[in-house]
Design a protein with these regions (language model features):
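Extended, low-hydrophobicity, polar/charged segments
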Residues: 1-152
Length: 152
């Protein structure tokens, strides 16, 4: 059983398909999540927090098969001089979530959206509750986030 997430109302009101899927163990990588749910690695949606300047953060919504984010390319797309991944403890201090458990919704940062997520009817990522994965229509990510740039 889970509590009602605030973002669930927005998904329902806008008609986006989603499911909350319980897990029996933590999932620590895109490959681990794909194997657990029997999906393609590209169907997983890891969330990365990056910093462009002091206290200027971007949420990166990525396809799991992208590999490492090209920070130089991402910075150019966001018109930022440079991007650095936010360190583990600082991610928790800023968001209240540990890296690897950051939710696809509920964090109010401008986003870099990976268009590769649109290959699938549902993508799988964090719900914000440990051992509960969100499978959601990737178009909801585009519609319900402040998209600063799109990664092709």
């Amino acid at each position: 059983m889970h509590y009602q997430f605030l973002w669930e109302n927005a998904l329902q009101e806008n008609g986006y398909a989603y499911q909350l899927l319980p897990q029996t163990r933590p999932l620590r990588s895109a490959e681990d999540g794909a194997a657990y749910f029997g999906i393609a690695v590209g169907q997983t949606a890891p969330v990365l927090l990056v910093e462009a300047a002091p206290s200027q953060y971007y949420l990166c919504l990525l396809a799991g098969d992208r590999g490492r984010l090209d920070l130089v390319k991402a910075a150019a797309l966001l018109n930022a001089p440079k991007l650095t991944p936010v360190k583990y403890k600082k991610v928790y201090d800023i968001t209240g979530f540990e890296p690897g458990n950051m939710p696809l919704f509920g964090l109010n940062f401008p986003c870099l959206f990976d268009e590769a997520l649109l290959r699938y009817p549902l993508v799988y990522g964090g719900s914000g509750q440990e051992n509960l994965t969100l499978a959601v229509d990737p178009r909801a990510l585009l519609a319900l986030h402040q998209i600063a740039a799109r990664l092709k």
